[in-house]
Amino acid sequence: MPKPMPKALVTAWVAAFNRQDVDALAAMYAEDAVNHQVAEHPVLGREAIRSMFQAGFAAAEMVCIVENLFEDGEWAILEWRDPLGLRGCGFFHVVEGLIRFQRGYWDKLSFLRQHGLPIPQD
């Protein structure tokens, strides 16, 4: 079976994210993948990434609406928004059909406020 190209993999990632399917999401990452949402510390490894998604979905109703999705070689770039108006951008490095590295840019303070979550005081 051919390995999915970055754009196709990220399209499947968005569908799994919107279903809050942590098992499907985790399966898209390499065992030693890194997920770095710049508002947070990097998350290392597939199981830790699965736990990150579980915690996120338990805390807030998250939906990813694709604005633009680009592919360049091993990279996919996702520009997104959510129903509350939050916007962000994600970079996915896909190697042999799995996400090896992901970096996301979004406004954490706006996210916390929109979802009524506590704002850290550090």
Language model: regions and residue ranges:
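C-terminal and inter-domain tail/linker signature
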Residues: 1-122
